[in-house]
Amino acid sequence: MKGQIVRIIAGFYDVVDLKNRKLYPLLRGSGLLRLNETSPIVGDFVDFEEKGFIKKIYERKNQLIRPKVANIDQALVFISIREPNFSSLLLDKFLLVIEAKNIPVILLVTKIDLDSNFENLLLDYQKMNYNIFFINNKKNEIPVELKLELEKKLNFVIGQTGVGKTSFINNFLDKKFAIQEISQTLNRGKHTTRVVQIIEKENFRIIDSPGFSSFSYSEISKNEIRNAFKIFKKFSSDCKFRSCFHFQEKTDQCAIKRALKDGKIPENRYKNYLYFLGKYEKKNY
């Protein structure tokens, strides 16, 4: 039988049959998998026995290390306007890791009722043709266009805690997961999601995962940092050297620095890029 792992708890695997969508809970990994030091993760396509073991893991089309998920069709990156406040640095961190794995992205901007200037904060990303939806969870409305984008795909949900991921999932899939308000003292959300799991309803599937503190950047290389910034791509081919990292090179040798000087690249996006390079050099994410 062929299925997909939808949840892992304490070494047990919940698997959904791909043909009839029936759930088979509490399966174990076979001795052969353990012998090969192969660990199944959420999203894996597997061969399994109905009342026993997972026997085979199929090749993954993509994979994140932490949270451990595989075979993502697209990522839903949540970012709030207020509580917690919008941060282009935080958003670029998410985009860096997701786009380095060539995973398509949809930006979901929440809490738009808290700031009438919400669209201006995302202008740079709109100019880069990101697919952006503005969400007001309190109105309990999900745009029809967004539903069409999510249908028949495995959608990976990621974002800082407190931005409204759980509220969105509750509204979208008619679930009743726990919701925590933003922490007043730290201006950060309290975690409500404890395990990585695939939540399914009809033709919609969403991977819910713990919040930002468990997200890992250690899997990103220096080249991937350079290549992940979409705003650089239209200029970088004009750099004098193919190995240009747009940092220590002279302005006349670096097309990115020239575009920055001419106002074609926003200064804050370039500063975010330099921040990631600096963190990489220190190996401190």
From Swiss-Prot:
MF (Gene Ontology): GTP binding; GTPase activity; metal ion binding; rRNA binding
Binding site for Zn(2+): 239, 244, 246, 254
Group of enzyme by EC: hydrolase
PROSITE patterns: ENGC_GTPASE, G_CP
Domain CP-type G: 61-215
GO cellular component terms, semicolon-separated: cytoplasm
Cofactor: Zn(2+)
Annotated keywords: Cytoplasm, GTP-binding, Hydrolase, Metal-binding, Nucleotide-binding, Ribosome biogenesis, RNA-binding, rRNA-binding, Zinc
GO biological process terms held by the UniProt record: ribosomal small subunit biogenesis
Family the entry assigns: Belongs to the TRAFAC class YlqF/YawG GTPase family. RsgA subfamily.
Matches recorded under PANTHER family: SMALL RIBOSOMAL SUBUNIT BIOGENESIS GTPASE RSGA, SMALL RIBOSOMAL SUBUNIT BIOGENESIS GTPASE RSGA 1, MITOCHONDRIAL-RELATED
Protein name from the UniProt record: Small ribosomal subunit biogenesis GTPase RsgA
Organism whose genome encodes this protein: Mesomycoplasma hyopneumoniae (strain 7448)
Source species taxonomy: Bacteria, Bacillati, Mycoplasmatota, Mycoplasmoidales, Metamycoplasmataceae
